[in-house]
Each structure stands twice: as structure tokens, then as C-alpha cells.
Design a protein with these regions (language model features):
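A short beta-strand motif that forms part of the nucleic acid-binding face
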Residues: 27, 171-175, 207-209
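Short, charged/polar micro-motifs that form catalytic or ligand-binding hotspots
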Residues: 4, 8-9, 45-53, 104, ...
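Hydrophobic (often cysteine-bearing) scaffold residues that line and stabilize catalytic clefts
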Residues: 51, 55, 110, 114, ...
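Non-catalytic protein-protein interaction segments used by genome-maintenance enzymes to assemble
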Residues: 136-191, 196, 250
Length: 304
């Protein structure tokens, strides 16, 4: 087994429920039904449609080409080049992606969203001058080690400008800005960058579907809406980074000790693919039902 490295997705999942982390990832010599070290197998009925993941991967690859292959240097042909790339890559990846079409938009709608969201990022990029004279890269690999804790991450976009400094961006294709996002994801990248380079970062989420000329309703409904740029800044301080590092150390130590006890809750179980296999989840349901029947609480099965 390769030495374990803690990524944000690992930390978030472990803090939600250690058993959830284990079943999604696998560990060491443990056999969860799919072989030693492999994740717990899922039957088709429990498996979630991957159409959202498909769009996210394609948009991320398009943005990666803009920066890492420097397609931005040929602006006249850029959009046509991106659309051609998305046409080909969509056909290729679609064959390898599990999609429940009764839950997903059509193929043409999925591809159209990939193209419009990529165009949305181009507009956000232009409006916010997201090219750095010092550094502009996408899908940047960060690997660090501190006090015996191995950590890693891959920020979507890293921009370093001599006038505005370092900016780390996480791209989102969400219909609802701010929903199902965790600001600590960006702070995690800031922590890694600080450990590696001793430099603080500015942080922001970029919402591909909402370029500057198309602000979301949630922004327009504010009492005094500011200018919409397509970016939502995330605050970060050295105190935030120290707190996150402490969480990482605690989780890392427990994972290496193979502490994988289930900690079910409405929030951690809501989007878990393993509800049917989890006795802790069933016990939680029974407990809620008992509370409801006794008049001491209420049952909320909206996540089941």
C-alpha cells in the first residue's frame, strides 16, 4: 500500500462519517467485497447517475486547455477550438460514464451546457483579467508534508499576478451559487500553498453558468447587490489555516489507526450511495421514527 495522502475530499468525507470514507475509498488489506484495498461495491440500483460529474470533467478539461496548452494566445479561434474539443471529448467520455437517462438531461442538453458553461468561464476570465503575468495554470498538483501528515490537492485554477497577487479559484457548474459548496475546500488549497510557498492566497469560486452579464437571482434579490463578476470571494486567514491543519492532523491520525466507525446523521447520510447497506443508517431511521411516534421529535426522511 502506498503511503496515504490526505486530500480535501478524504477529509470532508471522513469528518462526515469514517465508515463512509472507508466504503467510498477502500483501505489497506481490508476487503469490503471487491478485493483488498478496494472500495465497497455498489449494485446498479444504488448507483447515482454521473451526468453532473461528466459535465464537470469536460468543463474542467476545456479550462485546462485554455491555460495549460495556452489556447488563450489565439483568441480568434478559441471558442471554435473549444467547441470542437468538447464535441469529440463528450462522445468519448459518454461511453464510459454511467448515466440514468430518466434522471438526466438529454445528450444534446448535456453537451450544450458544457459549451455554454465553458463560454461562461471565458467571459468571467476576461472580465476579471484571470491571466497572470507570473503564473496561470489549471489543475495544479500540490503535495506537501508537515509534522508527518501527507496532504495533497488539485486546485482548478491558480493565477499569480504582480499587481494583485495569488488567486486560487474553484470552478462550479452549479445552478445555485453557494449551494452544496464548502468554503473550506478553497481554504484547504490555500493551506497547501502556504505550506509549500509560505504565501497567503486570495480565494474565489467561479460560477460557470453565471458570467458577469447573467447574475443569478439570489444575487439580484439582495437589498444592495454589488457588481456581479462571476466570482464569489472566500475569506481566509492564518487562523483559518491553523484550524484546518489541526483538523487534518486529527483525521490523518485516526485514518492510519483504522478508526472507521460509522457516525450517521441526516447531513452525512443524505447523499450517501450506501444507505441500503448501512446498518447505522437503518438504526438512525428507526430512532427517528420512534421519536416521531412518541411525540418527542419528528421524522425527516427527505434524504432517503
Amino acid at each position: 500500500m502506498k503511503p496515504f495522502r490526505l486530500y480535501w475530499s478524504n477529509l470532508e468525507r471522513y469528518e462526515e462519517c469514517p465508515q463512509k470514507f472507508l466504503w467510498y475509498r477502500g483501505w489497506g488489506l481490508l476487503d469490503l467485497g471487491g478485493g483488498q484495498g478496494r472500495r465497497k461495491p455498489l449494485d446498479t440500483s444504488s448507483r447515482r447517475s454521473e451526468h453532473h460529474a461528466l459535465m464537470g470533467i469536460l468543463i474542467a478539461e476545456a479550462v485546462e486547455n485554455i491555460y495549460n496548452k495556452e489556447w488563450w494566445r489565439q483568441p480568434k479561434d478559441l471558442l471554435a477550438r473549444l467547441n470542437d474539443f468538447l464535441d469529440k471529448e463528450f462522445s468519448y467520455r459518454l461511453q464510459k460514464t454511467y448515466i440514468k437517462w430518466e434522471e438526466s438531461p438529454s445528450k444534446s442538453e448535456l453537451l450544450a451546457t458544457c459549451k455554454s458553461s465553458t463560454l461562461g468561464y471565458l467571459k468571467i476570465m476576461k472580465h476579471n483579467r484571470l491571466l497572470g503575468d507570473l503564473y496561470s495554470r489549471s489543475e495544479v498538483t500540490l503535495k506537501v508534508e508537515l509534522d508527518g501528515v501527507r496532504m495533497g490537492g488539485r486546485p482548478d485554477i491558480v493565477i499569480n499576478r504582480s499587481d494583485t497577487g495569488l488567486l486560487i479559484i474553484d470552478g462550479k457548474n452549479s445552478l445555485s451559487p453557494g449551494k452544496y459548496t464548502n468554503k473550506d475546500q478553497l481554504r484547504w488549497y490555500a493551506l497547501l500553498y502556504y505550506i509549500a510557498h509560505k504565501k497567503m492566497s486570495s480565494l474565489a469560486f467561479a460560477y460557470f453558468r453565471y458570467p458577469p452579464e447573467n447574475p443569478p437571482k439570489s444575487h439580484l434579490n439582495k437589498k444592495k447587490p454589488s457588481e456581479w463578476t462571476g466570482l464569489i470571494p472566500v475569506s481566509v486567514s492564518e487562523k483559518d489555516l491553523l484550524a484546518l491543519l489541526d483538523r487534518a492532523k486529527q483525521a490523518y491520525t485516526k485514518i492510519l489507526a483504522e478508526d472507521f466507525e460509522a457516525t450517521p446523521s441526516s447531513s452525512s447520510c443524505r447523499f450517501c450511495d450506501y444507505q441500503r447497506d448501512c446498518s447505522a443508517f437503518r438504526d438512525l431511521q428507526i430512532e427517528k421514527a420512534d421519536l416521531s411516534q412518541s411525540g418527542k421529535g419528528f421524522i425527516d426522511l427527505s434524504f432517503s
